[in-house]
């Protein structure tokens, strides 16, 4: 975190749970979490440790929480939605101020749900009950920016290459884009006649993929490449989210 601050970054977003369903905090909702690992003899809490480090060094803290969970046996049922809302509540309650909550638009598909290989489909527009999610966030973290394909706080830019359109409006037409249903070109440029303020966020990895592999350490982006990404994201009226 000290390195992030020295690099001039404004905030850190931690992937608290990705699609695999493993939780980096000692959640009380599932055994599939850091509590049941050798890390710090089962007493570790990476979410808590990072939140504390961000507070120490004066940088904003945020979390990514995947709606899709390829581990939970009840994914695709109403019971899972309740579970997901409770996960969100834990994260929004126990770790101080959160400046952004990041919801991935990848939802439904193949997984090992409850240990059985299966494929699940959902109604992406209605399944997660986003109105209820927004109520939880308004109550527990009213200042938090909500990221998804369509906002409402900020939107995905429609690609994972780290750049926005040369013309990139901060508006969307309300109701035309929603989480899990991206309109790639429209997200890249926004709507000039939009009536909802939803600025774009450009996500890109500093290495070839999203996850760490030691053999890729000599393939990280160069200063020249990163500078170009900065100009094509921040310089195109968007924020830049750089994955490490």
In which residue ranges do the predicted regions lie?
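Mature catalytic domains of secreted/periplasmic carbohydrate-active enzymes
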Residues: 1-244
